Amino acid sequence: MARYTGPDCRLCRREGMKLFLKGTKCFSEKCPFERRPFPPGQHGRAQRKLTEYGLRLREKQRAKRIYGVLERQFRRYFEIASKGRGVTGERLLQLLETRLDNVVYRLGWALSRAQARQIVSHGKIAVNGKRVNIPSYNLKPGDVVELLDKDLIPVQEAISVFGNKSVPAWLELDRENLRGKVLRLPKREEIDTPVQEQLIVEFYSR
């Protein structure tokens, strides 16, 4: 399966904001974005005014990079969202938020979505009692997510960093047994991802 293998910090610089792709490094002085908060490349510092198309493209790219999704899969999410009930942009974000890797991240079991993706891929997560190793697996209200290896070092590190940080209202977390539950689909105001989803809708609807 295709995936991005370049430097994650380069993506943050390209989008002009921290995407928090590298866990604790993003909060430290070692974060390259702190030292070079401008796009990579020879002309990175140059001020360029984006066209309407450019603005929509950047918003789409930002969302893809935050959730770690490549173009083909992202477009498929949009097509599903556009055919479903409700507001297309909000539905798109709901599909991205209910990915298994994102829920593992939201529950505080990983320092980044990339780390959560690895935990899922290695078969450390069960959904409704069955092992699932597909990061893109979409969860539904009522689904129960459980960590199979509760002593996994990356998970323990994430728990120590996040502490008792509250989880989103649409999720329920049993901290003692490391078990989570999807209570319902998230509302738009409960999704803190810094994207303007309407621009993404306009990009694909052009």
Curated annotation (Swiss-Prot):
CC terms in the record's Gene Ontology section: small ribosomal subunit
Record domain S4 RNA-binding: where: 98-155
UniProt KW keywords: Ribonucleoprotein, Ribosomal protein, RNA-binding, rRNA-binding
GO biological process, one term: ribosomal small subunit biogenesis
Pfam assignment, any one: Ribosomal_S4
InterPro entries according to UniProt: Ribosomal_uS4, Ribosomal_uS4_bac-type, Ribosomal_uS4_CS, Ribosomal_uS4_N, S4_RNA-bd, S4_RNA-bd_sf
Molecular-function GO term, any one: structural constituent of ribosome
Gene3D superfamilies per record: Ribosomal Protein S4 Delta 41, Chain A, domain 1 (1.10.1050.10), RNA-binding S4 domain (3.10.290.10)
Record PROSITE patterns: RIBOSOMAL_S4, S4
NCBIfam families reported for this sequence: PRK05327.1, rpsD_bact
Function summary: One of the primary rRNA binding proteins, it binds directly to 16S rRNA where it nucleates assembly of the body of the 30S subunit.
Subunit structure: Part of the 30S ribosomal subunit. Contacts protein S5. The interaction surface between S4 and S5 is involved in control of translational fidelity.
Record protein name field: Small ribosomal subunit protein uS4
The organism of origin for this protein: Dictyoglomus turgidum (strain DSM 6724 / Z-1310)
Designated gene of the protein: rpsD
